[in-house]
Structure formats: C-alpha cells, structure tokens
Amino acid sequence: AKHFCAYGPVTAGREYASVDISERTLLEVHLPSFAAAIAAGVAAVMPAFTDLAGIPMTANAALLRTRLRGQLGFEGVIVSDYNSIGELIRHGVAADLSEAAALALKAGVDIDMMAGAYRRGLPGALARGLVSMALIDESVRRVLRLKERLGLFEDPYRRGAVGESDAVLGRRRTLARSVAARAIVMLKNAADTLPLPGSVRRLAVIGPLADAPAQMRGPWWAAAEEHGHVSVVAGLVGALPDCEVMHAPGVSIQQDEPDGMAAALRACEAAEAIVLCVGEAAVMSGEAASRAHLGLPGRQRELAEAVCGRAKALGKPVIAVLFCGRPLIVPWLIERADAVLVAWFLGSEAGNAIADVLIGTVSPSARTPISWPRAMGQVPIFYAQRPGGRPANASDPYTSKYLDEANEPLFAFGHGLSYGRFALSNLRVTPHEVRARDTIEVRVDVVNQGRRTAQETVFLFAHDTLASVARPVLELKGWGRIELAPGQRGTVTLRLPATQFCFVGADLTAVFEPGEVEILVGPCAQRSQLLCASVQLS
C-alpha cells in the first residue's frame, strides 16, 4: 500500500512538495484506506516522498511506528520510495547518509530502495551510536519473515519471467479490451449522437491522439512493448470494415509542426461524422507530471474549435474523445461537441475498446471518480465539503460563492451516461431506529426506460444533519450496479453496518452520536438527483 500518508494534498499541486493538513483531515480522509488495506492483509507499506508538517514521511516515527504499526496494527515490511532515505539530506533533517539511515531505521523503515543509505550509512550510524544492533535486527527479522512467507528461501527465483502461450496472451488481450471499455466515461450524448449508426460509411478521425498507439499505454508502462497497442484509427478500421476511416492529426500535442489544420477540415467535410481525439500526452500524467494549466496542451484547442465550427456549419456530429490522467478543464469543448467520452489511458486494447463503445457493441458504464471542475479556481473541488456558516445563497450576497463562476462542478462525482435511460424510485431503509451494532438495509427500484441494455450505478451517501462537529454535506458509504434490458425493472440492495456512522469527534476520537442521519441514493453526487430517506441513530 502506498504512499503513506497524505501524499496527495501537496502545496500548489506540485508532486513531492510539502503537505500541511489538520489532524482531523488525516484521521478522516487519509488513514482509513490504509486501515482497510491492513485489515485485508497487505504485506508492505511505502512512505511518501513528502514531508507532513515539516517531518519527512520516511523519517516520521510518529506516523510509521506509533500510528501505522502501533494503532493500525501493521506487522509487515515498510519499504522506502526510490532514494527517499538519501533525500532526507535534501529535506534538511540529516547531514549525511549515516544520519539519514538512522532516522529512517528509527522511524521503522525496513528496506532502503536504491539510496544505498543502509549499505553505506548504517555502519557509520552504528559506530556513532545513532542506532543499535537490536534496531537493525528488528527490521531484518521483518524482511526475513516476508521472504519466508513468499517461499523465497526454497526458491529464490520463483515467479520469474516465463513465456506465455498464444492462447494465454489472447485471453489477456480479451480481458484488457473488456476492462478498457468498462473504464470509458460518457460525459455527454446530446440527441443520442452515440452509438454511431450502422449505416455510417465515411468517418473522420481527427487529432494528434487519433493514431498514437504508444500514447495509449499511459505513464508507468514499465516493460510494455513498443508494438501491439491499438490506436483509435486502427480500432475503428477493424470495427467498421464497410466504412472509410479518414485520419488527419491536424496538430501535434506539444510541438509546433507543419500545419495540418486544412487537411483535418477537408476530412470533416468529406465525412458523415467526426471523432475528435485530443488530450494529454502520456508523459503529462503520472509521477512528476504536475500541470499548472489544465486545458488542452499545444494548439489542440485551436484545432478543436475549428473542427467543431466547421462541423456545425455542415450539420455533422462531433464526438470528442479525451485522453488524460486528470480532469481537463474544457467546458467550451463539452458545450460544442455533440458527445464526449473520457478515455483516460486505456492500455494495449484502447482503440478496440473505444470503437466498441462508439459503435454500441458495449454500452459505457464507467463513472467519474472525481468531481470535474469548471475552472482552475475551483480546485480542489469535492463533494464531501462541510456546509460552513454561510453556504451559497443566490439571494444573499454575503455567502460562499464565486463572483465569476458557479460553485458546483461541471460534472459531479459519479457522473456517467450509458445507452440506457434509468429512473430510480421507491427508496426504502430499514430499520428506522438504528443502534451501533445494527446493519441497515437500503433498497431502491431501478427501471431502464431506454432502448438498449445497459448498466446503472447506484451510489449510497449519508449526511449527519446535527452533530458535535460540522459534518460533510455528503459522505459516500457504498455503491451497487445493476444491468437491465429495455423496460426491465430491478432492485438494488445495499447493506451498511451502523458503525459506518461513527465519525471523528471534537476530541479526535471515534464517536457514535444519536440523532438523524439522511440516507441519499442516486446516480451521482448531485443533490438534486438523489432520493432521500432518514434514520434515527440511538
């Protein structure tokens, strides 16, 4: 499990930068996922590169020893991130490798990844009395226990590289295609632009990411081969054998190259529909890839505006496919395109998976795992905010608002369309009176009012209306998924232990307080789309 802990909320959104958050945020937001991983039996934990309130995580004994091992009960191995022990010198908390090694070891770090600090620094630390042999033995025992569990004493090379048959590789490609298709989020589908009609005979696939198989790998592809990745163009050519697929990149992602805009617009004129593939290069996401501007890089906006303008004049639909590792702030494109898919970086079968969704072989079923911002000034934006004493109120100027933008995200957490059309009704919650040892059952009816079989995701949120500390307006407590044919009805049932209503009290310990809790169920975190019932905690 990594990276422990609070690796995300860095200063100015720059990776590796300092973190300074409240104890409450640490307890409520960042530690629970590690507690769950430990309960599931995770074998190793990696500390973050960052410091938290001035203490580098690699040397943070209070969090690694007291919290992680002592309070959360972690008994496995702690392994440093790449060179992070040596980087304690740059943090300014160690003068040399011996001091750095001593700080990390005393914090509970068992394995030094690539810094050479333990190999070169621990002998000096031991000689200077900075660490004891007993402390070294403690970490050695944890490492040896893990090796024993993995069977490495009997077979040091187990699970080494082995060849795979064509049949096994084929099954892996099939799985990769299915997983990729299920990861595509449809943000917009005006006038049922998608799926593409089976009668389409000329299709323009425009943009620098339309025929870019290597970009489909995304960041951190490690040992992935250069060949064998399917681009959008290749996927559509394979899926539509009777359709002429015309490709024009238009512009590059970053560099100023010879202008292909005219060729792209000619392709639009000749086509019945346009698939516009824009977004980030793979290297713009992942580690050490923070961006200050979250629009389309390079001249892609110029291309997209030209394509959308020409298509509108010609009366032809534009389907925008966004490739990105983060939400891109492109409200102008969302407005002007007829349909919008978020394809992230889908891997080796990306092009085939995108084609499956575009032609309707697969109904999109993924949902946004974040709140999608309208503007940079909204970041960070999330659904679990506290109400504050002056929540937004259009009739009162002295409330929490922007002068130049709406408070709400462009798309709420959990947003995502499909080729079905779903309606939720008849929310039931039992029991109404809930004690700490109870489990509540939440049931909601779902009907597919559309013309295609599709999946709907149902989210379960809670809101504690009155408590000893201000509670978030929404907290995610569970989710379920159901597949329904046209006209079919079904029921989603979710069960929730009442202990899920515990929260961090004013004294920073867990409390279960009596009172009313709202149970909210719906397709996303937009309050207006949620059905609501309530239970009484006692």
Feature locations, PLM:
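Short beta-strand elements
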Residues: 527-538
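Glycoside hydrolase catalytic-domain context in secreted enzymes
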Residues: 1-505, 513-527
